[in-house]
């Protein structure tokens, strides 16, 4: 402290500022780094003293045009270079539809039968195989090219196909008859490994509906029966000669000690060939064809079913003269075989007509039992069907791996001469009333004229009656639909399992038998009747009243189930109405197969409702138009 008692003021440093700055710069680098890190935030330069990196960019940002705005009405103006794309841009589906061009990804879309593939029921057959079969049978044009007996060949035009001018074999007949006429191979001695394998030849005849499958297997069977009959007569003659020679020797050696002769086994109740069919209606139809050939070929045939009385069945099967060909149902034949085991002891040919039905769940045990009992004497097993479901194909591959498959090129296809129309019952005026839509379609068909000419006798006879089949899915609805149609003035009848057997035969006869051409007496009678009606004037008001009544004339309708969809030869039917959409393509084939038989045209109509599979109906219709096989 100084004299005034205060602290002395600090003296100014003797070192100048420049020297002090140099001393600070000469500090160690470690101390300097520590100091710079501590004061880094304080030493950051302010924004106004830093240049902006966007100085070179313009203040107004130029908008880039998108792909949609790049091309416009003025896009090509003031351009210095051509903007050509290396790869053109793909057009939208809407633009392709407007221009009518096919879409680029049409091949990636689902092909035909997308809906049917989801419920595939039939076994597919490659089209290469179909083409090979078609080329193979192209050279066969006449029944004379088959190695048939002369008496059998001459009976084809007179008994099997009467009334036809040009008698030519169908594709299935060209395939099946030569193969079925082949003699079976020489039997080799069975071994232990071959005990379970069948020792007879197996054949599968698969062809479209109405293609003549019945005649394809019937002619070879009749030919084989006649050949066996001739061989049996020769053997019987030799046996009688040997027995006579032995009898003479016994008489010489032992005149008073003669052994009693064993009587030969009777042929009563022992058919040579059996044809199995699933229904009694098919028994009657096939039995008539078998009987027709017997008039000229001379063999004994018979048919038995549940429609016949027990006395008639016994007289037919156990006739003293024997029986050669028998047509029966599996359950009836199996029940007879339990009490009469010799019924199947002489069977050399066994035919399963409609094999897909005879080998399904309901018939398979009975049919298999009959085949196993007839196996010791069986030489040929023939399976015949218009459809090959997957279940049948798997069964045949497992049980009969060596079966010979004879399939036609048009298997599983509905003929193109059959047209299919679709009626939407949800639209006006039906509004979901399926029965009303069915009645309206029938009235339209009945009132329309017949497209085909009725022949040169059309002006002499009465108008031709139109026959229409209506298929329903449930048997209970057959009577209901028929009753509704009758209330609308339509001559309709129902046919189902609940119908009387005698009534079934009468009804089916009207729809299966084509009317023959009128005789000269019938033409004269029709002319007299017409002159008589025209000469009485007071009958004209009655005719007018008849015409004004709500009755559909010259039209008959049969409402039925699948009972009449398999094998029934409905030559007189030109129209089929599917009251319900069938469950599978198999039902489509069999129901529409009642049309287009023997080369005739037909028309099918399906009623489609709100809950029906319209996509399935559409694909079936497209497949029919293209002539392709269904799946």
UniProtKB/Swiss-Prot annotation:
EC nos: 3.6.4.13
Stored Gene3D superfamilies: P-loop containing nucleotide triphosphate hydrolases
Localization per record: Mitochondrion
GO BP terms in the entry: maturation of LSU-rRNA from tricistronic rRNA transcript (SSU-rRNA, 5.8S rRNA, LSU-rRNA)
Region Disordered, annotated ranges: 68-112, 180-199, 229-249
Enzyme class at the top of the EC tree: hydrolase
Function: ATP-binding RNA helicase involved in mitochondrial RNA metabolism. Required for maintenance of mitochondrial DNA.
UniProt-listed InterPro entries: DEAD/DEAH_box_helicase_dom, Helicase_ATP-bd, Helicase_C-like, P-loop_NTPase
Source species, domain of life: Eukaryota
Family indicated by similarity: Belongs to the DEAD box helicase family. MRH4 subfamily.
GO MF entry, a single one: ATP hydrolysis activity
Name of the featured protein: ATP-dependent RNA helicase mrh4, mitochondrial
Transmembrane segments: none
Any single Pfam family the record assigns to this protein: DEAD
Alphabetized PANTHER family for the sequence: DEAD-BOX ATP-DEPENDENT RNA HELICASE 50 (PTHR47960)
Composition-biased stretches (Basic and acidic residues): 98-108, 180-193
Transit peptide feature, positions: 1-45
GO cellular component, as recorded: mitochondrion; nucleolus
Domain notes: The Q motif is unique to and characteristic of the DEAD box family of RNA helicases and controls ATP binding and hydrolysis.
Residue ranges constituting the Helicase ATP-binding domain according to the UniProt record: 194-406
């Amino acid at each position: 402290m100084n004299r005034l008692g205060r602290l002395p003021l600090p003296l100014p440093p003797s070192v100048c500022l420049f020297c002090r700055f140099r001393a600070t710069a000469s500090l160690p680098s470690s101390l300097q780094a520590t100091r710079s890190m501590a004061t880094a935030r304080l030493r950051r330069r302010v924004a106004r003293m830093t240049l902006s990196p966007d100085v070179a960019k313009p203040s107004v940002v130029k908008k880039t045009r998108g792909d949609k705005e790049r091309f416009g009405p003025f896009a090509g103006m003031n351009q210095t270079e051509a903007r050509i794309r290396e790869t053109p841009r793909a057009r939208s589906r809407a633009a392709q539809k407007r221009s009518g061009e096919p879409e680029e990804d049409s091949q990636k879309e689902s092909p035909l039968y997308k809906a049917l593939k989801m419920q595939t029921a039939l076994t597919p057959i490659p089209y290469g195989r179909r083409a090979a079969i078609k080329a193979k049978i192209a050279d066969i044009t006449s029944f004379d090219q088959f190695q048939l007996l002369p008496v059998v060949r001459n009976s084809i035009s007179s008994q099997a196909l009467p009334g036809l001018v040009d008698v030519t074999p169908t594709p299935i007949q060209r395939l099946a008859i030569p193969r079925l006429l082949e003699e079976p191979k020489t039997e080799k001695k069975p071994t232990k490994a071959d005990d379970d394998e069948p020792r007879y030849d197996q054949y599968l005849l698969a062809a479209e509906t109405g293609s003549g499958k019945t005649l394809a297997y019937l002619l070879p069977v009749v030919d084989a029966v006649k050949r066996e009959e001739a061989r049996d007569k020769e053997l019987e003659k030799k046996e009688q000669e040997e027995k006579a020679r032995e009898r003479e020797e016994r008489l010489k050696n032992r005149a008073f000690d003669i052994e009693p002769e064993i009587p030969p086994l009777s042929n009563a109740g022992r058919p040579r060939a059996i044809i199995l069919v699933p229904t009694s209606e098919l028994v009657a139809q096939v039995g008539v064809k078998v009987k027709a050939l017997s008039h000229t070929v001379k063999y004994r045939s018979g048919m038995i079913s549940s429609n016949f009385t027990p006395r008639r069945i016994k007289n037919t099967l156990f006739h003293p003269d024997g029986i050669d060909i028998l047509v029966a149902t599996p359950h009836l034949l199996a029940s007879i075989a339990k009490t009469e085991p010799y019924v199947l002891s002489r069977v050399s040919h066994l035919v399963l007509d409609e094999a897909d039905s005879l080998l399904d769940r309901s018939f398979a045990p009975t049919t298999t039992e009959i085949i196993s009992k007839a196996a010791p004497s069986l030489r040929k097993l023939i399976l015949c069907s218009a459809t090959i479901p997957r279940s049948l194909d798997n069964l045949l591959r497992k049980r009969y791996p060596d079966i010979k498959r004879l399939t036609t090129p048009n298997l599983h296809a509905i003929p193109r001469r059959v047209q299919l129309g679709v009626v939407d019952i949800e639209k006006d005026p039906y509004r979901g009333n399926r029965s009303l839509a069915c009645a309206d379609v029938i009235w339209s068909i009945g009132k329309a004229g017949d497209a085909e000419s009725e022949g040169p006798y059309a002006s002499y006879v009465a108008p031709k009656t139109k026959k229409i089949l209506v298929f329903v899915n449930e048997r209970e609805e057959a009577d209901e639909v028929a009753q509704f149609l009758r209330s609308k003035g339509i001559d309709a009848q129902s046919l189902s399992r609940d119908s009387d057997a005698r009534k079934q035969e009468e009804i089916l006869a009207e729809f299966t038998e084509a009317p023959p051409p009128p005789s000269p007496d019938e033409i004269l009678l029709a002319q007299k009747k017409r002159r008589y009606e025209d000469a009485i004037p007071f009958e004209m008001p009655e005719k007018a009243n008849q015409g004004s009544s709500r009755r559909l004339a010259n039209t008959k309708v049969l409402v039925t189930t699948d009972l009449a969809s398999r094998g029934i030869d409905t030559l007189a039917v030109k129209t089929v109405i599917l009251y319900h959409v069938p469950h599978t393509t198999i039902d489509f084939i069999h129901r529409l197969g009642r049309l287009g038989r023997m080369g005739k045209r037909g028309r099918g109509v399906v009623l489609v409702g709100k809950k029906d599979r319209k996509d399935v109906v559409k694909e079936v219709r497209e497949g029919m138009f293209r002539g392709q096989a269904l799946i």
